Every structure is written in C-alpha cells, then in structure tokens.
Amino acid sequence: MFILLMFVLLLQEILANSRDENLTELNSVLEEPTYSYRAINLPAEHIPYFLHNNRHIAGICKQDSRCPYKVGFYFVLHKYLKKLKSCWGYEKSCKSDYRFSYPVCDYVESGWANDIETAQQIFWKQADFGYIRERLNEMKTHCKPTVTGDSSLTCSQFLQHCRATNLYIDLRTAKRNHERFKEDFFQKGEIGGHCTLDVKAFLAEGQRKSPLQSWFAELQTFTSLNFRPLDDGKCDIVIEKPTYFMKLDAGVNMYHHFCDFVNLYITQHINNSFSTDVNIVMWDTSSYGYGDLFSETWKAFTDYDIIYLKTFDSKRVCFKEAVFSLLPRMRYGLFYNTPLISGCHGTGLFRAFSQHVLHRLNITQEGPKDGKIRVTILARSTDYRKILNQNELVNALKTVSTLEVKVVDYKYKELEFSEQLRITHNSDIFIGMHGAGLTHLLFLPDWAVVFELYNCEDERCYLDLARLRGIHYITWRKRNKVFPQDQGHHPTLGEHPKFTNYSFDVEEFMYLVLLAANHVSQHSKWPFRVKHDEF
C-alpha cells in the first residue's frame, strides 16, 4: 500500500512538472515576436520609410502586440507618429508632401534654372533621393530567365549598377598581376548565367567603360550558358547570402573611400534592403592587399569580414543573389567631382546616410551644452597644409568663455575611427585646413558649421560636400590676411598652394569663428537658440 501511495505521489509530481514546462514553453512562444525587428536596426526617424517600402513587415507589425514600432492602427514610432505614407521620395507612389525632405535653394543660377522650384528639382535629381529615382527608371533586364530558377541580369544605364541571380563565375584559370581592375580578366563562358541575353543591347552599354565608373569591363563577356549552374552541379562553391560586389577607391583617403560607402548606401536603397546579413566582395584582379584606414565603417553594412575576390581563385563560384554596387567615380555620380547647381543645399540622402552610419556604429550625440559652443580644430601632422600659428589661434579662442576648444589629430594609429566620429559628431564648429579630414563634416550635427580654414584655391570640393550634407560652410575670405610659408613645391607641377604651410591673422580668424558661433546659436535645430547677434 505504501509503495502504491508513493507511486501516485511521484506520478502527480511528474505531471505537475510537465505542465509547468509546457506553460513555460508556451509563455516563451507567446513572448517571442513574430518578426526579428532587431535585425532592422535603423535610426528611429527612418523606420516609417522602411515600413512604407516593406508593407509585409508593416502588416506583421500591425498584428503583433510586441512590435516596437506600433502605436495605433496606422501609426508607427511613439516618438514621431509618422504615417505609413512617409516615403523617401524615389518611390513611384510617393507624394511630395510625404518625402523624407526636400533641398533648399537660396537663389537661382542662370543657365541652370529660371525659378527656385525648378532649381530645387534639379538639385534633388542631381544629388538627393531623386538621383535614386533616376537610377531605378534606368533599370533594364539584359539577360532574361525563361523558367523559374533560371539566372537573370538587370542593370542601370552604362552598367553602373547591376543585379544578378544564380550568377556563375569561373575563377579556375584566374591570372593576377599588378592591375587592380584588369579589363580582360574573364573570357567567354567564365561569367554568366542560364538566361537569354540580348547581346547587341548589352554591348551598347559600354560608353562609360572605366574602372571606377562602370561594370562594363567586368561583365562584357557575360555569357548565356547552356547549363543551369546550380541545378547541374557546376558550382564548387554556392554562396547563399546576398552578395555585394564593390570596386573600391583609395582606402587611405577618407574623401575617396567615403565615395565607396555613400554609393553602397545608395545601392541599398535601389535594392530596398539594409540587411547586414550580406557578403561584401572586394572586386580586385590584382594579387595585392588593400589598405583600409576606415574599416570600422563596414560594420554599418555587413556583419562579416570583407571578402577578396581572390579568395575564390581556382574555384567555380555561384551566387544566388549578387549586386554590383554603384561606383565611386561615376560621371555625374556621387560625390566625386559632381557638377551641382549653385545656390542649393541640404539633401535628405546625405543626411540619411550620416544618420545611418552613426546609428549602426553606435555614435551618439552627447550634447549640445547650454551656454557652450564646442569647437574642434583638426591639426595636421603631414608635411603640408599645417597651421603654423596654431597655438596662437587656440589661445585666442580660449579667451572666449562660451567656446569649448579641442585640438585633435586624427592619426589612425592613435585614434580609432569610431572615436574620431564620436569627436566630430559632438562638435558644433569643426575647423581644418583643406584635406580629406574635412570629409568628417558628413557626421557633424545638423546645426554645426564647418570652417575650411583655407581652401588652397580648391574652392568647390568641401563647399559642395557641405552643401550635400546640409551643413553651413565658411572659409577664409581675405587673401591679404593669410600668410603662406612659401610658394609651395609640388613634386612635378612646381609651385602649388596645397604644398606649403600657412599662418593666419588672429583677429580675422576670431571674427570668422564668432560668425560661425552666431550661426550655430541661431540654427533652428539648436536647442538653446538665442537672439540675433548675441555672439
């Protein structure tokens, strides 16, 4: 009897434990969101625009009580309460009232436009989300699939950007030398897919064939294959993840390398995907490595290390989804030598890029500070364009109690790039000589001023970049108050203003800095806005 009683008690305990475990599992299932919202990982301001273009995710969010973006039936983001009508601007259904933003034009330049409205539209198409609309409208399928599972190749004009499915690349006979972008790297049959290629139309796209302007050289031998690479076992390696191919500009120069990152961001918009669960393959036909001083930035775009094309040498590789990214030096591209209409500034595209990178790299705004303007001076330790009387200028700034002055030298061996970005993003006035370091202006807060102390007669470079970002720009105005060390000594061109060092009149310098401080204090986004001329 005692044994029977013990058995009954043990059975009850087992059933109770089993019930508790089932309840725990059920609660776990109930608590689990129906979509991995964390993977979206976009700035809060961008979420409504993302959901506008991903209605299936918006639908899941609407039905999911645990969706972090849900604040009502048609609203997202408790912080902004933006309607799902919000759109970047390039979408066909996008109405102008719901665009992310629209540029400002202060005047009309003759030869470009007759009125402000036309000037705004031109600038929007040149350098804002209208630029993406133009690229989307150009997309053409050159290699068409016949049945489900076939390959495809779709490109913008001049093959500046392409998308491929079930792409076949044969690197078994790859021959590498010193050329980073060898034009005859592939022979017929070594790159292609099982699809129907319009050869004549495809080869007509080669008008801008150039290493950093087009993918024509790499794709000109694209072949319509008589086999299905994946189905017929022709692949030594199959890459399942979406893969971005990129031809990179100089990785040691911030200005040039950020042309790569900006164009990758634009490419993501074209493909409506900001996932970091992607591969990025550096397209380089040489046997060299690649020096990259800004490698931390890749974390904004991928969870994985950058792959070199040569990693696949001696293999036949098949990519289920491949994207050939927009390139850094395209004619009329962004932002290298881009011809821009004068008088206009403030693209939503470049502001969104800045927000995107800062968010993904966890760079936060720690200010601004009430009663203080944070001034950062970018020093140079290079041979040329040094500020000879830098200490004198800094001491003058420190006599103004409202200015909080910091001098930095962005040496990559001493200061990680993420820390450089943190300093830049927490500056209200950013001062530096002409040079690639001024590309940091992309990551200044909206109210900031960039002061190119002296442009060395290269007037448009950082002025135009500041216009794209929507940051106020000033530079030295009185030539008789800047003092070059000598005439400059270019290695081959002789006298050159970029190849010497400079001293500056302290009084004029202070006048310009105080003008900049006044602009900051009156900016609409400055939380401690003061009356005109307080500085």
Curated annotation (Swiss-Prot):
Glycosylation sites (chain numbering): N22, N271, N362, N501
GO CC terms, sorted: endoplasmic reticulum lumen
Protein name: EGF domain-specific O-linked N-acetylglucosamine transferase
Gene Ontology BP annotations: protein O-GlcNAcylation via threonine; protein O-linked glycosylation
Organism: Gallus gallus
Catalytic activity: L-seryl-[protein] + UDP-N-acetyl-alpha-D-glucosamine = 3-O-(N-acetyl-beta-D-glucosaminyl)-L-seryl-[protein] + UDP + H(+); L-threonyl-[protein] + UDP-N-acetyl-alpha-D-glucosamine = 3-O-(N-acetyl-beta-D-glucosaminyl)-L-threonyl-[protein] + UDP + H(+)
Enzyme Commission identifier(s): 2.4.1.255
A molecular function (GO) term: protein O-acetylglucosaminyltransferase activity
Subcellular location field: Endoplasmic reticulum lumen
